[in-house]
Swiss-Prot record:
Gene3D superfamilies, alphabetized: 1.10.8.50, 30s ribosomal protein s13, domain 2 (4.10.910.10)
Entry GO terms, CC: cytosol; small ribosomal subunit
One example GO MF annotation: tRNA binding
InterPro entries xref list: Rbsml_uS13_C, Ribosomal_uS13, Ribosomal_uS13-like_H2TH, Ribosomal_uS13_bac-type, Ribosomal_uS13_CS
Region (Disordered): 95-121
Record-given protein name: Small ribosomal subunit protein uS13
Transmembrane segments: none
Key words of the record: Ribonucleoprotein, Ribosomal protein, RNA-binding, rRNA-binding, tRNA-binding
Key word rRNA-binding present: yes
Source superkingdom: Bacteria
Amino acid sequence: MARIAGINIPPQKHAEIGLTAIFGIGRTRARKICEACEIDYAKKIKDLTDSDLEKIRDHIAQFTIEGDLRRETTMNIKRLMDIGCYRGFRHRRGLPMRGQRTRTNARTRKGPRKAAASLKK
């Protein structure tokens, strides 16, 4: 099993798909990494040589991935909340921040519906 950036890459997957197991690497970036390392992206991870894996590790070291990327994202959101801007306020309240409607929908951000209080006499 190949280990890149502290992540075990599934050996039965193609190189392009296997690299997406690393947080911060999607399909496009994975394909570009394979092209830069001159590796066929359709080749299985288990069929890659140690030198191929070393090339991939060296190339991936240039990017912000995994824990550093998660930390950076969290710090960016925290900064928005600290400066008190609109987006930070929406993050704090758990609401969508890009202009979507919230009277109906927005259930992903708001969570399950809360039962309406009944008005019995």
